[in-house]
Amino acid sequence: MRALAVTGRITQLTRFRFVNCFLVQEQDGLTLVDTALQAAEQILAAAERLGAPIVRIALTHGHGDHVGSLDALKRALGAEVQVLMPEPDAQIHAGERPKTKGGWPKLATAPDVRFEPGVRIGSLEAVASPGHTSGHVSFLDTRDRTLIAGDVFTSYGGVAVSSRLHLRFPFAAMATADPRQNLESARALRALAPSLLLVGHGPAVPGPAVAMERAISRASR
């Protein structure tokens, strides 16, 4: 698993070349955003290298490539870690509403907190960005406006909106439940004027305004 410090406070961890999760440094420890898959040992090792404990796991959405290491991490960390999942996706995992497109693995771990957009998780503000899943959220780091956009956008092979198939990385679009809603979310995220774009699949994109706008334009055709 490749670890790359993308800001002074955020480390991007990449599994299988194109599946990302993020360790965000806070005063009380680390927030892990998403968990990749089959990566618990590597994530724990990365946290150890940073010299801080993982105190919470905040999920952008409930697809398997974002929650795939959750059970193993919860077993390793126990009550020391708080798990937070967007309410609609938590309902799907609990069997309270039907599954949508994409992989929804069976989880032994129930979230400690089901949250709605607008909440603050440490320095991260949860921003509504539904479409890829009904509950999908993004996280804006209020300290420097770094945006963790989950699967609203991808950047593997170039920045793209996950509302339309991108030949170099089609998988996110194939798993998007509502492409039109996802496109509206992409526009809303662009309006936040992030300083850095981080996504679930692909490299970090500094100064992303032009790339986001072009991706939105392509997806709108």
Where are each of the predicted segments found?
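Short, flexible loop segments at the rims of nucleotide/cofactor-binding pockets, characterized by
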Residues: 8-13, 33-36, 59-60, 124-128, ...
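Metallo-beta-lactamase
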Residues: 38, 125-128, 134-210
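Active-site HxH/HxHxD metal-binding segment of metal-dependent hydrolases
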Residues: 38-121
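Conserved beta-strand hairpin/beta-sheet module of binuclear metal-dependent hydrolase folds
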Residues: 1-49, 139-150, 155
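Residue-level marker for buried hydrophobic side chains located in beta-strands
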Residues: 31, 58, 83, 146-148, ...
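Binuclear metal-ion centers of metallo-dependent hydrolases, dominated by the metallo-beta-lactamase
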Residues: 206-221
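A short catalytic or substrate-binding loop motif that flags glycine-/basic-rich loops and adjacent residues
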Residues: 14-17, 129-133
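Short glycine/proline- and charge-enriched loop/turn segments
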Residues: 98-107, 162-171, 219
